Design a protein with these regions (language model features):
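Helical "lid/coupling" subdomains associated with nucleotide-phosphate turnover
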Residues: 3-53, 68-71, 76-188
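Conserved catalytic-loop position in the HRD/HxD motif
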Residues: 58
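Acidic, divalent-metal-coordinating active-site segment for phosphoryl/phosphodiester hydrolysis
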Residues: 62-68
Length: 188
């Protein structure tokens, strides 16, 4: 299956034809809604059910999916074209990033995902479930291990641990991030 990057590519048809021609694969391009649904099903394989309303976040390159779930059901889902590859291409950011740029990005994501924030407030969500490589990288930095060294099904990241990594990343240059224990080079 193909997701956001192919969904919105100008050369989508040519790309899919070439891929099929060279590999023999028939690739189905799924909607953002279907992507969110599959993410939810994958999370349920890992945690079985939510003890309280929770929001799932998948940070992708082309899109971010947010799914509000409770028990074993999703209540609401969205897919927005706010993935990190798109953000990097859209905004010119300093190295290290400046405080004003952080605020600009916070405003951008808040506006793009305002419906998600509203739904989370309505359901009094207190738990974020991350299910992408970005969250694996945060966990690897916290655990001070090399990327892929630890295979995890789940891992709780405490808020203070997250903010410690967050502050470190904000203050660091690209070169410094490349040498951080746990940092996956594709996430620098």
């Amino acid at each position: 299956i193909a997701t956001s990057a192919v969904r919105t590519a100008e050369n989508k048809i040519e790309f899919l034809e070439k891929l099929s021609e060279q590999s023999g694969w028939i690739v189905k391009v799924i909607t953002g809604e279907k992507e969110a649904e599959l993410i939810f099903k994958g999370v349920l394989l890992a945690i079985e059910k939510f003890e309280q309303p929770s929001v799932i976040l998948d940070i992708g390159g082309g899109s971010n999916e947010l799914i509000l779930g409770d028990k074993k059901e999703w209540l609401w889902k969205e897919s927005q074209p706010t993935g990190m590859a798109r953000v990097i291409n859209r905004f010119s950011l300093s190295d290290p990033i400046h405080k004003g740029e952080v605020k600009m990005l916070q405003d951008y994501f808040t506006e793009a995902h305002k419906n998600a924030f509203t739904k989370c407030k309505e359901k009094e969500v207190k738990t974020l479930i991350g299910c992408s490589g970005a969250f694996d990288t945060i966990a690897d930095i916290i655990d001070s291990i090399n990327p892929g060294e630890k295979q995890r099904r789940t891992q709780v990241i405490k808020l203070d641990e997250f903010y410690k990594v967050y502050e470190t990343l904000l203050k660091s240059t690209r070169e410094e991030r490349l040498t951080m224990k746990g940092m996956d080079f594709v996430r620098v």
